């Protein structure tokens, strides 16, 4: 019998490249391949011997990483000392990988990538009993800071051309313009002139070198949050494609650049700014608890960078640090309210570190500014953000501070919030710009929410907390406050001036729940007939916006709606449409819900003092023309809360139905509200905010 010759060395095959294999698309195996060339990315070819298949797959022995051209090892007898060094190296790699996976197990939900890593370890451990084992382990990139295995990339599938969205100057410039219009006025963490010089004029950003990882991640985050702020109409007008397509590409780019910049380890404040913008965009796009989970990283990174203290001596650096820290406090407050937990930043820490930035425009200072700049009067670039910062501070005290129990202290906090907020709204003409219009109406919503939170706190009553009794002499009803918030949200979603800010405004579930419960116990049939279409529209919009966010909240609202619908069908009969109602964003919704008109424009006002006289304030000092603004401010602060009613900022009688309600007994109204809170706690849902969506 002729003796079989030695086995011929297997030639390395040109397999699918790494990116095509990751994206699960067909690769033409060129160098570079056509897919990578069209996407504008670097093609990483894979050349190695083909792996055995079928019955021979179980006999596979992986190739040594030091010799990718080596033949595949098969089960044959080998000397006892063969592969000892490789086995020791393998065990060390496995030990480190196991430690990484164990550190991830503390998370409430393990990502798909984490589970795949555990499966890889288990399959590897089952095969290390052979001495001749040479393994090429999975690639672990320590530079990504563990973000990929934490699930930062999510489940979004990459699309062709996603990597070129930053390098495409036309797209990046358009998204930057969208950011300056829709995002920058409400999320004020960047310096507008520096951003324009960088992304619109092509200059370097704040002295960073070209293609710095932190700057690239910030640019990608700006594009991502700008894409989420687009409406479908704006997306087609600017990019000739759907909004979902732009958002998917921008999100994938943002996540990739963030992983490269390693925000968990980076000492740059710019990287944290990019990470925060990513969380803002992700929260707008994804209502799940992913952002609530990732907020822990943002808070820890901010503390590691010493943001609460703001030790930077430069005026520019101080302003940027203050803006970023308070924006993190705001997002921490918002995200924790929809989940069964209190904010990560405690009330004491948020109060002690509350140092708001200057009420100025971005054009008033530059990165080289070292001297202090005084606050401006009137509407500035930071007005809305400053109001939001005061909102989260008041919301923490009213909802998460155990010492704030009695009605007097709660009303004092509300009065303090109103005084600080109204000072920022001097000489604001809502007809001047969409930003001024949006700020005007959102502040009314915030004031209503603060008053509603003082009357109906969200702290669960365990019996040891006294129930705050509302002051009936104020003439403001609970249902009117709740309806005012819902109508203001609907106004932003129907008025063309609110188009750029609709991504930021959703229906808060707390005023919605209060309005539903108050309709159940209200005895005024005419009032319920006028209020119920507003409640129905808000409920439908809430279900569409936050589907998947909190099952307990959705279940509680559905139970309330079913109960009230059943009662209204019996009491009102066929005169009221119970199951069908207008939805936000429709053409007829404004007429159906009697949306109020905006206050008169500045053209019909003869002086700055007359502008304040259009508000329902009876203080004579506020209506005199020619008064010193400082004196007007002092008069505003010294005025009693009964005389200052910011809830009535030139509102039509249709907006508030005050004076038409029959006040129900306090114990009956409280019983309905406590039932809602108890239901949420039974479903393991935490407290939430009354005036932040």
UniProtKB/Swiss-Prot annotation:
Keywords: DNA-binding, Metal-binding, Nucleus, Transcription, Transcription regulation, Zinc. SUPFAM superfamilies: Zn2/Cys6 DNA-binding domain. The keyword Disulfide bond does not apply. Gene3D superfamilies: Zn(2)-C6 fungal-type DNA-binding domain. It is found in: Nucleus. GO terms for biological process: DNA-templated transcription. Residues 589-608 are annotated as: Disordered. SMART domains: GAL4. Residues 17-43 bind DNA. GO terms for cellular component: nucleus. InterPro entries: Sec_Metabolite_Reg, Transcription_factor_dom_fun, Zn2-C6_fun-type_DNA-bd_sf, Zn2Cys6_DnaBD. It comes from the Eukaryota. One of its GO terms (molecular function) is DNA binding. The keyword Transcription applies. Transcription factor that specifically regulates the neosartoricin B biosynthesis gene cluster. This is C6 finger domain transcription factor nscR. The lineage of its organism: Eukaryota, Fungi, Dikarya, Ascomycota, Pezizomycotina.
């Amino acid at each position: 019998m002729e003796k079989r010759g030695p086995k011929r060395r297997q030639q390395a095959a040109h397999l699918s490249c790494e990116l095509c294999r990751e994206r699960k698309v067909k690769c033409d195996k060129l160098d570079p391949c056509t897919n990578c060339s069209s996407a504008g990315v670097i093609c990483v070819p894979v050349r190695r011997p083909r792996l055995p298949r079928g019955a021979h797959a179980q006999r596979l022995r992986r190739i040594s990483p030091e010799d990718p051209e080596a033949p595949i090892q098969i089960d044959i007898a080998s000397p006892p000392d063969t592969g000892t060094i490789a086995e020791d190296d393998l065990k060390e790699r496995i030990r480190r990988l196991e430690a990484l996976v164990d550190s991830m197990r503390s998370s409430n939900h393990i990502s798909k990538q984490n589970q795949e890593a555990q499966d890889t370890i288990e399959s590897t451990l089952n095969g290390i009993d052979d001495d001749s084992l040479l393994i090429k382990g999975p690639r672990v990139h320590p530079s990504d800071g563990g973000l990929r295995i934490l699930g930062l990339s999510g489940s979004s599938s990459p699309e062709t051309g996603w990597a070129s969205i930053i390098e495409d100057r036309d797209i990046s410039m358009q998204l930057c313009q969208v950011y300056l219009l829709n995002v920058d006025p409400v999320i004020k963490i960047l310096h507008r002139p520096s951003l324009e010089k960088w992304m619109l004029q092509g200059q370097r950003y704040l002295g960073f070198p070209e293609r710095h990882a932190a700057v690239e991640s910030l640019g990608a985050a700006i594009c991502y949050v700008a894409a989420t702020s687009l409406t479908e109409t704006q997306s087609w007008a600017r990019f000739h494609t759907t909004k979902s397509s732009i958002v998917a590409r921008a999100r994938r780019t943002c996540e990739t650049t963030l992983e490269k910049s390693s925000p968990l380890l980076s000492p740059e404040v710019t990287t944290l700014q990019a990470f925060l913008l990513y969380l803002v965009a992700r929260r707008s796009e994804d209502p799940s608890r992913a952002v609530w989970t990732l907020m822990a990283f943002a808070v820890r990174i901010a503390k590691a960078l010493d943001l609460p203290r703001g030790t930077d001596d430069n005026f520019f650096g101080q302003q940027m640090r203050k803006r970023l820290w308070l924006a993190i406090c705001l997002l921490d407050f918002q995200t924790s309210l929809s989940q069964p937990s209190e904010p990560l930043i405690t009330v004491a820490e948020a109060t002690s570190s509350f140092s708001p930035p200057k009420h100025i425009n971005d054009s008033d200072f530059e990165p080289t500014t070292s001297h202090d700049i005084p606050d401006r009067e009137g509407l500035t670039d930071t007005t809305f953000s400053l109001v939001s910062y005061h909102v989260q501070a008041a919301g923490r005290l009213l909802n998460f501070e155990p010492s704030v129990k009695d009605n007097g202290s709660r009303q004092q906090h509300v009065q303090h919030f109103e005084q600080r907020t109204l000072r920022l709204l001097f000489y604001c003409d809502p007809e001047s710009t969409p930003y001024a219009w949006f700020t005007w109406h959102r502040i009314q919503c915030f004031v209503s929410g603060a008053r509603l939170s003082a009357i109906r706190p969200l702290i669960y009553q365990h019996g040891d907390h006294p129930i705050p009794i509302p002051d009936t002499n104020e003439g403001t009803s609970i249902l009117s406050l709740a309806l005012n918030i819902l109508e203001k949200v609907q106004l932003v979603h129907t008025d063309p001036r609110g188009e750029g800010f609709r991504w930021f405004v959703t229906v808060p579930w707390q005023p919605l729940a209060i309005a539903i419960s108050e309709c159940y116990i209200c005895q005024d049939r005419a009032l319920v007939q006028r209020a119920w279409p507003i409640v129905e529209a808000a409920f439908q919009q809430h279900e569409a916006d936050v589907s998947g966010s909190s099952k307990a909240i959705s279940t509680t609202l559905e139970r309330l709606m079913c109960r009230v619908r059943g009662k209204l069908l019996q009491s009102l009969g066929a005169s009221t449409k119970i199951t069908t109602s207008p939805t936000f964003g429709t053409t007829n919704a404004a007429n159906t819900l009697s949306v109020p008109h905006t206050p008169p424009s500045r053209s019909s006002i003869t002086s700055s003092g007359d502008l304040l006289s259009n508000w329902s304030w009876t203080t004579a000092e506020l209506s005199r023309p020619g008064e010193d603004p400082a004196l007007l401010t002092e008069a505003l602060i010294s005025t009693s809360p009964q005389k200052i009613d910011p809830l009535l900022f030139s509102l039509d009688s249709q907006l508030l139905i005050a004076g038409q309600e029959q006040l129900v007994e306090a114990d009956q109204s409280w019983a309905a509200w406590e039932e809602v809170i108890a239901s949420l706690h039974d479903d393991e849902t935490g407290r939430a905010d009354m005036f932040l969506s």
